[in-house]
From Swiss-Prot:
Organism: Corynebacterium glutamicum (strain ATCC 13032 / DSM 20300 / JCM 1318 / BCRC 11384 / CCUG 27702 / LMG 3730 / NBRC 12168 / NCIMB 10025 / NRRL B-2784 / 534)
Pfam families assigned: Ribosomal_L18p
Subunit structure: Part of the 50S ribosomal subunit; part of the 5S rRNA/L5/L18/L25 subcomplex. Contacts the 5S and 23S rRNAs.
GO biological process, one term: translation
Official protein name in the record: Large ribosomal subunit protein uL18
Lineage, top ranks: Bacteria, Bacillati, Actinomycetota, Actinomycetes, Mycobacteriales
GO cellular component: cytosolic large ribosomal subunit
Length: 134
């Protein structure tokens, strides 16, 4: 059997690259969530990143309630000039303001299987600058 035939056999049938990446991210998120738990003292700050927008929530896992939320879909963020990274930073500022208004100082950061890079890192840094402690 030639080397090219071996390579062709190793490719998983019926799964494109996008599906494999999505499944791998879901697996990473599952592994991360096994060790993270949001409490009333330190709720979980969870990030969701799509190709166009970012959503972030502060969740108390014990009560099962969302305490604060922010998104790049909001008009305040849409008006922000710049790239997606700048908009992610604006979402981080918003969630920090809303957390402070709700009396939240400390959070547990849940990156949801995404790399701590780019928009996710910009959001986290802006939230830290806004006064949230991770």
């Amino acid at each position: 059997m030639s080397n090219t035939e071996n390579k062709q056999k190793r490719v998983s049938v019926g799964k494109d690259i996008a599906t494999r990446r999505r499944v791998a991210r879901a697996r990473r998120h599952f592994r991360i969530r096994k060790n993270l738990r949001g409490t009333p003292e330190a709720p979980r700050l969870v990030v969701h990143r799509s190709s166009r927008h970012m959503h972030v929530q502060i969740i108390d896992d014990v009560a099962g309630h969302t305490l604060a939320a922010a998104s790049s879909i909001e008009a305040e963020v849409r008006a922000t000039e710049g790239d997606k990274k700048a908009k992610g930073a604006k979402v981080g500022q918003l969630i920090a303001e809303r957390a402070k208004a709700a009396g939240i100082e400390q959070v547990v950061f849940d990156r949801a299987g995404y790399k701590y890079h780019g928009r996710v890192a910009a959001l986290a840094d802006a939230a830290r600058e806004g006064g949230l402690k991770f």
